[in-house]
């Protein structure tokens, strides 16, 4: 009999035990952590004796050119956290050299291009030579230790080469997602004052060419006071592109002239490794700064334990390198451990919705990591796309980016994993650098919708948002904060440390403020409730949008929902919900009323939406995130303040939604 948990009045949330196959099968290696008791013992040591725990882990997983002596220094209160003082290492050496020396013919990168037959396999020996060449090219362009380098490139191996070449010479890479507009790219280039931009002639995605070089040109042309002196261009498609003499240089020409050896620069553990600008923010760009030693240890440890990486595994993360998930779980995490990492250039549905599943079968992938949005989208397209595809190589299925709803979790577990794989619903942020709450495949019973238990070194607390006091009783929802520093957490905002302190350390002194709300259940499992600023105040009731969205998605007809607040003269705000339906579900008369009653029943009458819009899709970024900011502007009539929508997967959906909202708001029978 499976245990059940009651959350939000739902009494049928099943606790899934660790799959027996992972613990008692000759086909699976023994997990690194193979019992809940072992996890609890390791976690206890990691928070009570962090110097001992992370000192040992740092020596085990990383190679140091100069040993560290002081494991941890500083505090959240002082805003001066540092790890592995006196120690020196190089991220490129840890990701490439040491594996190339040991096993040069092992595959480091499997690149599956936009077309399924475009597959490249790059060994660690080959990767070392390419990284050294690019490092020498960057030196030839005047890049030195501590200089920022902007990278605006598609999902190709050369992007990884560029990242590791920067790390090799001590340059600070700033990767900008290659779907961002020229305006956003310009903001980031100006903020970090880079002199060198790396790009490609074009990118490829979903059967379409993407004009990356033209976007770079536009970003630099529209702002004459930028600092850029060189644009290095990789030839991806061979299409003709505009050329600025004296500034633009061809990648292949410079690489042909470069030596195949470049000594790695010794870096202090606290030297900057990269900047990553948070997406969707307004105002001045916020460049999150990660340092070398702590970050590298965090991503290596989470790949080892959360994805249970074993020798000869094939690890696949479907994120874009332009996001932190790509940095941590395509590049640095797997390569630090000497893994084979899969780099995927296309989309889940090109040329058909079997693409992900065929990818798993073709490359015999053992760990697969993607977003709930992708899972839900593929679920909506039907199970037939998984037919006759052998995915028996899988051991771990990962979810990232947002809490995964129960129905999607069940489908992922049963249809993709066949009930034989661990499902790890991971919670973390750009600022944390690596996963901070997650199950461990061989140790943690799982509950659909819960990220479960904290990873090593993470001491989570729930705080009363008004008083800042810790909430210790189970079943309470509060602000999620972290009590103690951890190696991989960001150290600052680039050139603006006071902003870092004000945003993350000052709201609740002595804690790191995640900005998310969470609930802890009777088993100590953590349920992420969404951003605490995603709160709607209706007649004095503070309502979490994620809770209302969960109530809507629990209806059998609903695939996805997004809830935002609209101004109301009487109640302050009212609730508007955008709902998309599952395939083959017909819009029935009275469905809005049924969904409203569902919310009233799940949360209460005060949470009932004022408007429910049945829509074909939501405005989403190319990484699958629903842009609620845009929906908020639409329902409040601020159509002239939408900002840049070029990053959306389908910008045309915005006009469709505006028309629908305007039309329904003028009809007498819009709301039941």
Curated annotation (Swiss-Prot):
ATP binds at residues 401-403, 425-430, 516, 531, 542. Disulfide bonds: none annotated. Keywords: ATP-binding, Ligase, Nucleotide-binding. Belongs to the ATP-dependent AMP-binding enzyme family. Signal peptide: none annotated. Its EC number is 6.2.1.1. PANTHER family: ACETYL-COENZYME A SYNTHETASE (PTHR24095), ACETYL-COENZYME A SYNTHETASE 1 (PTHR24095:SF14). One of its GO terms (cellular component) is cytosol. This is Acetyl-coenzyme A synthetase. Induction: By acetate. CoA binds at residues 205-208, 325, 539, 600. The gene is facA. PROSITE patterns: AMP_BINDING. It comes from the Eukaryota.
